[in-house]
């Protein structure tokens, strides 16, 4: 599996720079990905809250310049991790807001959080710190996520939530202008 995952990652990285970017409404992408997880959430008695804050432009969205299917991949991977580490009945929160030049997407869960002293390690290639009962993982998923975010001229950071158990991942992407 590791060789297959690594091979696919290299192909994806090579094709990323050739894919066409376009104006994308990030709210629509998030809603689409959350819809894809709906049955899993029902089966596990978990829920996702989507919170849209700040001013939304006149076209009713937060727009960025990007590759739609790659941004879906980013959101799906981050949600999949949050769902995996959350217990039944826990809530995952996606918050979408803005700064003067960027769109900020924050995903928070109520799982155990990061055991690493430096949570940024999770974005390193081949790094995995999942418990054995989670099955085998290649440690490539979050590295791919980071590469996609950086291709979009964005940043991604991970931290533990303050004063509450859980993880927080923030993705900052430039607004479409």
Go through each PLM region and give its residues.
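Short helix-loop "hinge" at the ATP-lid/N-box region of the Bergerat-fold HATPase_c
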Residues: 82-83
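Short conserved segments within the C-terminal catalytic ATPase subdomain
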Residues: 40-55
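Conserved micro-motifs of the catalytic ATP-binding
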Residues: 14-19, 59-66
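A conserved beta-strand-to-alpha-helix junction within the catalytic ATP-binding
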Residues: 20-38, 54
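Short conserved segment of the HATPase_c
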Residues: 114-126
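Conserved glycine-rich
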Residues: 154-155
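Short beta-strand/loop element within the Bergerat-fold HATPase_c
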Residues: 89-101
């Amino acid at each position: 599996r590791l060789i297959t995952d690594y091979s696919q990652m290299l192909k994806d990285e090579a094709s990323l720079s050739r894919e066409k970017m376009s104006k994308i409404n990030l709210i629509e992408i998030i809603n689409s990905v959350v819809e894809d997880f709906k049955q899993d959430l029902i089966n596990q008695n978990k829920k996702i809250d989507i919170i849209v804050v700040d001013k939304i432009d006149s076209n009713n969205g937060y727009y960025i310049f990007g590759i739609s299917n790659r941004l879906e991949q980013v959101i799906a991977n981050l949600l999949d991790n949050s769902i995996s580490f959350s217990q039944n009945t826990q809530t995952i929160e996606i918050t979408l807001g803005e700064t003067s030049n960027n769109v900020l997407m924050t995903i928070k869960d109520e799982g155990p959080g990061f055991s690493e002293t430096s949570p940024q390690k999770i974005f390193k290639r081949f790094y995995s710190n999942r418990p054995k009962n989670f099955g085998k993982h290649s440690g490539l998923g979050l590295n791919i996520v980071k590469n996609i975010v950086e291709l979009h001229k964005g940043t991604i950071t991970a931290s533990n939530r303050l004063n509450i158990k859980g993880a927080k991942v923030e993705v900052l992407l430039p607004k479409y202008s």
